[in-house]
Swiss-Prot record:
This protein's GO CC annotations: nucleus
Subcellular location: Nucleus
The keyword Transcription belongs to this UniProt entry's keyword annotation: yes
Similarity-based family: Belongs to the 5'-3' exonuclease family. XRN2/RAT1 subfamily.
The protein, known as: 5'-3' exoribonuclease 2
EC number(s) on file: 3.1.13.-
Cited InterPro entries: 5_3_exoribonuclease (IPR027073), Xrn1_helical (IPR041412), Xrn1_N (IPR004859), Xrn2/3/4 (IPR017151), Znf_CCHC (IPR001878), Znf_CCHC_sf (IPR036875)
Start and end residues, zinc fingers (CCHC-type): 270-287
Record organism: Cryptococcus neoformans var. neoformans serotype D (strain B-3501A) (Filobasidiella neoformans)
Disordered: region residues: 411-448, 533-678, 965-1036, 1072-1130
Pfam families: XRN_M, XRN_N, zf-CCHC
Feature: compositional bias, Basic and acidic residues: 411-447, 541-551, 570-588
Oligomer status and interactors: Interacts with RAI1; the interaction is direct, stabilizes RAT1 protein structure and may stimulate its exoribonuclease activity. The interaction also stimulates RAI1 pyrophosphohydrolase activity, probably by recruiting it to mRNA substrates.
SUPFAM superfamilies (alphabetical): Retrovirus zinc finger-like domains
Length: 1130
């Protein structure tokens, strides 16, 4: 989810929710022939973390990304090698958790249109970043060639792997799907610990985001009485929204697994990526950038694998049970609905579908601000903001009004904090530069020797490395430096240049005699080339001061999509200079190898989410900062020209139809600002909105939307669209996709002050279907990634006569929108016109091959089981046996044999029991054909949902022992002030718990771990075990009897408008809160209590239309919901 700092904020505010994972590692033993071999981990052993896991869910995109383009080490060379890395990583994660019932692996499929806008932005920016890096690599090669060295053809023609391939419908995703099927079959055949597992693979051909497909499966399963209310879940993934999704299931035994990104690397302290020295970061470095030989491949450094951590959702629920209690409420407290309100308020701060409100930044305490308003207004609202995934619009207006009162103060405080931070950073930078100068002076003192009144200095001796070291094996290496008088050292470069010129004009013998001088001249030429490539020249200190002064008056901005006329001339001059220097390098080159300095192309430090693309935030070529100008900012050339972008905007205007959503960016082009990216990823720019000054609303709407504040009708359209988005997101998290084609049609959010009459908004979502994979690729890919599309579709992205050419601007503007980091900027891309895109795609479909048509179709979930699983014989008999002929209707799963898992199955046409599974990666010798294959696969269909998801704990729930002490709770009630907050030192179910002052430490959850994955854990003593000490906190008593998921109590059922005011909460006592009923959002009639309608009441047609779940309220409930579990024959 789009809240990069959410995980850190949660772990600091609620420290006990984080546990370090205890992980078994393979032991090295001596084999039968005396060789050292690794003994595999015994999966069937008890979980070392002290608790057993029933179901493990893997958001596979969180595994694929770090395996295909890892940080800190070279990426795998081929896609087959990437598959092996994915296998290794997945097995490590599975061995940490050791699920006993279900392992579900979900890959992102076609996303809802609301998410595709964000995907489009990321992929365009990733392509732009890749182009910048490729340009820098080619410049480095030119520099190396100018030094007189050859660059291999392989190095010169090397192309980096395009990370945009990780998108549904590409050949890479097709390979990933079949490779995971192979690996799962291999594990079921060879690992006895997997024999009882049911593995569900939902690949990229099944519509929906990976984590939402997982949650949809959980919601459907828990709507049946066969579901175990005490099922323990773990979900792996890197997205912060997994925490919200886990809470939204109201399954209390849930943990989120992820890498500990804040763990200290085993490589030791980080070195500067500019100079390679320890003690400072690249942003504060004064040294020249290092260079490396482009022919030398990067070698991975050995380091310990990153540790993992659990985020304990049950513990987070304990914190929220304290945090969300409001004294003196006129209605009963319901923790489940209060948690829903808390989740909804986080959506205001950030999500993947809407830009966050300008006044809300999580780093500024935005969640606490909203929570404070919610606590103050909850008694007056008379009920909760949300109701089982529906928003009460009248109550949402109350929260927005409370935020509106604070917006001016928030903006002013933000400006004060930024100025204070900038002053502090400038002071630290100056101090760091002073320290570097002192270190440099000490180094020079060490390299200076006074002898007989003459001062000698050490100068580099390239001859020491010219031929690789010693003259003869019996002789020592040449020294790496010479001692020369200081006066001669100053004149030496000049003399070397003169010698080189004379030698090159002479005979071959002159060249040989003066090869040292020629080599030094080549290196000088290379330095000149570097200065030209970086937009600078070799100048003295006084000249640098003049340039720095000039720079204050001239525009040095970079990372824009347009070049000015002056910049075009400057670029032409640079190209001429490069050509001259290259020619000089070829003429003056000698046949000797010189080990050059390293060419640094790594990214500098900057904070950005895993897998998030940035716009040249870290890879700019930099000019070394002058000692007397520590705040000098490096420059970067601009890319692209303005004509293409202007044309595309014109086409957008001409082709917009009346049915398309409003697109103010197309109607009112925003003046493009020029950006300047620093070494640390921050951006220097002029903020022309100035939210901290009076009149900011007028400036904001004029700059961002191209309208005046007085145009109230337009602003009302923006606020309604935004409120639609909030309702869409909440329902997406709780009930499934409301509408696949809905999206927020603006790049910016309105102010809280501008929402009015929210309760009267008529919000409806119409039923729709997801895109096909190739339609999504055309909707999110830039033209640079067209190689992943079939050839007939590639022309739509580049041909001048393409009807959708304007969807693929070669350059685009990044608006920083008040942010500091480059990756936080807003990519101002034109929104896709769905009708035009689908029409263009249809015109090319006849040209697709059969295999390409298969890739462009929806697929099925697949379930794998081993031959020892109780379901194996049933599947073979009913699906693959002699009596199983022409099976066309899905067969229900026997819930007794599946331990409560429901659904239906059909034969997998790619599976023949007991046959050989051909390897999809034949180039990998460790992955041969699988023979015999002791597993079986079937097409698996999720069960229809028996009733809408409800925010309650299921009957039979058994609470875990309390994590929080009374001291912890008091600390939370005080808002984290006073006392000492508790935290966990060790991971696992029996980590140490530290309370506030004077509290004894004890081990909770002592006693034997669960050994049976299918039974609830035995009662555990709170008074320690053999390994514990002290006393643990007793388990809390439930505030009221568990409420049945099927009714329980006489709760006040429904009012036809789920977003209207609720009836008197006292009407039904402690019954379940009122779920929603079908009806228009803006209508307010009250109806007598009725059972909640079931949008899943009629089973979906076995092969009907794909979902929508997105029915209009007021219309009859649709058949099915979420996404269609039977997509194969749509």
């Amino acid at each position: 989810m789009g809240v990069p700092a959410l995980f850190r904020w949660l772990s600091k505010k609620y420290p006990k929710i984080v546990e370090r994972v205890k992980e078994d590692t393979p032991k090295k033993i001596r084999g039968p022939d005396g060789e050292i071999v690794e003994e595999p981990i015994r999966y069937e052993n008890p979980n070392p973390n002290g608790f057993e896991v029933d179901n493990l869910y893997l958001d596979m995109n969180g595994i694929v990304h770090p395996c295909t383009h890892p940080e800190g080490r070279p990426a795998p060379e081929t896609e087959e090698e990437m598959m092996v890395e994915i296998f290794k990583y997945t097995e490590r994660v599975v061995n940490m958790c050791r699920p006993r019932k279900v392992l579900m692996m979900a890959i992102d499929g076609v996303a809802p249109r609301a998410k595709m806008n964000q995907q489009r932005s990321r992929r365009f920016r990733a392509a732009q970043e890749a182009a910048d890096k490729e340009e820098e690599r080619r410049e480095a090669i030119k520099l190396f060639e100018a030094m007189g060295h050859a660059v291999s053809e392989e190095t010169a023609n090397h192309k980096s792997w395009d990370t945009n391939a990780i998108t549904p419908g590409t050949p890479f995703m097709d390979l990933l799907s079949i490779s995971l099927k192979y690996w799962v079959s291999h594990k079921l055949t060879t690992d006895p610990g997997w024999k009882d597992l049911k593995i569900i693979l939902s690949d990229s051909s099944v519509p929906g985001e990976g984590e939402h497909k997982i949650m949809d499966w959980i919601r459907r399963q828990r709507s049946y009485p066969t579901w175990d209310a005490n099922t323990s879940h773990v979900i792996y993934g890197l997205d912060a929204d997994l925490i919200m999704l886990s809470l939204a299931t109201h399954e209390p035994h849930f943990r989120v697994l992820r890498e500990d990104v804040f763990a200290q690397s085993s490589k030791g302290p980080h070195a500067c990526k500019n100079c390679g020295k320890v003690g400072h970061i690249a942003a504060n470095c004064k040294s020249d950038k290092k260079f490396k030989d482009p022919n030398v491949a990067e070698v991975a450094k050995t380091e310990d694998p990153k540790p993992f951590i659990f985020l304990d959702v049950a513990c987070l629920r304990e914190y929220l049970a304290v945090e969300l209690v409001v004294p003196g409420m006129p209605f009963p407290f319901d923790l489940e609905l209060a948690i829903d309100d808390w989740i909804f308020m986080i959506f205001f701060v950030g999500n993947d579908f809407l830009p966050h409100l300008p006044s809300l930044e999580i780093r500024e305490g935005a969640i606490d601000v909203l929570l404070k308003i919610w606590r103050a207004e909850l008694p007056r609202m008379g009920g909760y903001l949300t109701n089982h995934g529906k928003v009460n619009l009248d109550r949402a207006q109350v929260i927005l009004e409370g935020l509106a009162k604070s917006e001016d103060e928030i903006f002013q405080k933000r400006k004060d904090d930024e100025e204070r931070q900038e002053h502090s950073q400038k002071r630290r930078r100056i101090e760091e530069h002073k320290r570097q100068d002192e270190d440099k002076a000490r180094e020079e003192d060490r390299n200076t020797l006074t002898l007989n009144g003459t001062e000698y200095v050490a100068v580099d001796n390239p001859a020491a490395t010219a031929r690789g070291g010693p003259l003869h094996p019996s002789l020592p290496s040449r020294p790496a430096f010479d001692l020369v008088p200081k006066e001669d050292a100053v004149k030496q470069p000049e003399d070397q240049d003169q010698k080189a010129k004379k030698a090159m004009a002479g005979s071959n013998s002159d060249i040989v005699k003066n090869r040292k001088a020629i080599r030094m001249a080549n290196m000088s030429a290379a330095q000149a080339l570097k200065a030209e490539l970086e937009g600078g020249n070799d100048v003295n200190v006084d000249d640098k001061k003049a340039i720095a002064q000039e720079g204050k008056e001239e525009d040095e901005a970079v990372v824009t999509v347009e070049r000015t006329e002056d910049e075009e001339k400057e670029q032409l001059t640079k190209e001429e200079a490069r050509g001259t220097l290259e020619e000089q390098g070829e003429k003056e080159g000698v046949d000797e190898e010189v080990v050059p300095p390293a060419i640094q192309t790594d990214e500098d430090e900057g904070e950005a989410p895993v897998g998030d693309a940035t716009v040249a935030e870290n890879d700019e070529s930099t000019i070394p900062e002058d000692d007397e100008d520590p705040t000098h900012v490096p420059r970067k050339r601009k890319r692209g020209d303005s004509d293409g972008d202007e044309d595309s905007n014109e086409e957008d205007d001409d082709d917009d139809d009346d049915d398309a959503p409003p697109n103010p960016e197309a109607d009112q082009p925003i003046p493009k600002k020029k950006l300047k990216v620093n070494a640390d990823g921050t951006v220097d720019y002029e903020d022309d909105v100035k939210l901290w000054e009076p009149g900011y609303r007028e400036r904001y709407y004029e700059k961002k939307f191209g309208v005046k504040l007085s145009e109230r009708e337009f602003i009302d359209k923006v606020t309604k669209s935004y409120m639609e988005g909030l309702c869409w997101v909440l329902e997406y998290y709780y009930q499934g996709v409301p509408a696949w084609d809905w999206f927020y049609p603006y790049h910016y959010a309105p102010f809280a002050q501008d929402f009015r009459d929210v309760g009267s908004m008529d919000i409806k979502f119409e039923t729709s279907i997801p895109f096909k994979p190739f339609a999504q690729l055309l909707g999110v890919f830039p033209a640079a990634s067209r190689i992943h599309l079939p050839e007939p579709l590639q022309t739509l992205m580049i041909d001048e006569d393409s009807p959708i050419l304007d969807f693929y601007p070669p350059d685009f503007e990044i608006d920083m929108n008040g942010k500091k980091m480059a990756w936080q900027g807003v990519a101002l891309l034109p929104f896709i016109d769905q009708n035009r895109l689908l029409t263009a795609l249809k015109s090319k479909e006849e040209l697709l091959s059969d295999d390409e048509k298969r890739r462009n179709s929806w697929g099925d979930n697949v379930m794998f089981i081993a031959n020892e699983n109780p379901l194996y014989d049933l599947f073979c008999d009913k699906l693959y046996g002699l009596r199983a002929k022409d099976v066309s209707k899905p067969i229900p799963i026997d819930t007794k044999a599946s331990y409560g898992i429901t659904g239906s199955v059909l034969p997998d046409p790619n599976c023949v029991p007991a046959s050989t599974f051909d390897t999809p990666i034949p180039s990998i010798s460790e992955c041969p054909d699988l023979n015999p294959n002791d597993s079986i696969s079937v097409r698996y269909y999720f069960p229809r949902q028996a009733h809408p998801h409800r925010s309650i704990l299921l009957r039979g729930y058994k609470p875990e022992p309390a994590r929080l002490t009374e001291s912890d709770k008091d600390w939370v009630r005080r808002g984290g002030q006073g006392g000492r907050r508790g935290h966990r030192h060790n991971g696992g179910g029996n980590g140490n718990v530290t309370g506030g002052p004077g509290m004894a430490r004890g081990r909770y959850e002592s006693g034997p771990p669960r050994t049976n994955g299918y039974q609830p854990p035995p009662p555990r003593s709170n008074y320690g075990g053999s390994s514990g000490y002290g006393y643990g906190a007793p388990a809390p008593l439930p505030s009221r009897p568990p409420v049945s998921s099927y009714g329980g109590g006489a709760g006040g059922y429904g009012y036809s408008n789920p977003y209207a005011a609720a009836p008197n909460p006292y009407a039904g006592g402690y019954g379940a809160p009122a779920p929603y009923a079908a009806g228009g959002y803006g209508q307010r009639p009250y109806v007598p209590p009725l059972p909640p309608p079931n949008p899943y009441s009629a089973p979906p047609p076995a092969y009907g239309r794909p979902p929508g779940g997105g029915y209009g309220y007021g219309a009859p409930p649709p058949r099915g919901g979420g996404y269609n579990p039977y997509p194969s024959r749509r």
